Amino acid sequence: KVNVFSPTMIQEVSNLLDQVPTDKGSLLIVGRPGIFSAGFDLKVLMSGDAENAVNMLRSGFTMLSRIFSFPRPIVAACSGHAIALGAFLLCSCDYRVGSKGEFQVGANETRNNMIVPTPILELAKFKLAKNHKQRALLNGEMYSIENAIEPGYLDEVVEPDKLLEIAMVKAKDLATLGHPYYHQTKQLDQEEVIKKINSGIEKITVSAIMPK
């Protein structure tokens, strides 16, 4: 299992977001050891069922938009490889802690004959370092997890046995941020990019990702 975002998994995460308090606390997202996420379920994208594929894409990008704009802080414990949508999930979170290891982080879409669509481009441009935008998004460069801080995928990298401990400490610290002050500041910061992300989601088609 590589933690792919299938329609079922996207729905499960979306249901979880519905249940998390939006006026207090914080949220910690953790992947399985060795793999944070490898992105969308390619079997669905390549199944020939365009409606199912589009629904998966739109719901997946909507999920990222919700995480990105969530009223409370979200911390990611990146436990391994974070590829494609997995890397963009990191971009959606407010603080990202990575585990040392032989892991890669990055967006490999252009190296796999796929397009990085508008919602993801807008999210990534907002979170990734400007001097890495060409390398990360257009060149499809993959970064070792220990080199993923400079481009903006991660905020710190720690020993594997300390990952959850340090991520939890950070989540508890961010949970003390006052409501609604954190949320309202985030809204002001993200106002323009959220409009672009959500507008792009409405226009998503399979050919916008995988042109014939």
Which residue stretches match the model-derived regions?
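Conserved CoA-thioester-binding segment of acyl-CoA-metabolizing enzymes
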Residues: 1-30
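Glycine-rich beta-to-alpha transition loops that act as phosphate-gripper elements at the mouths
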Residues: 77-83, 136-141
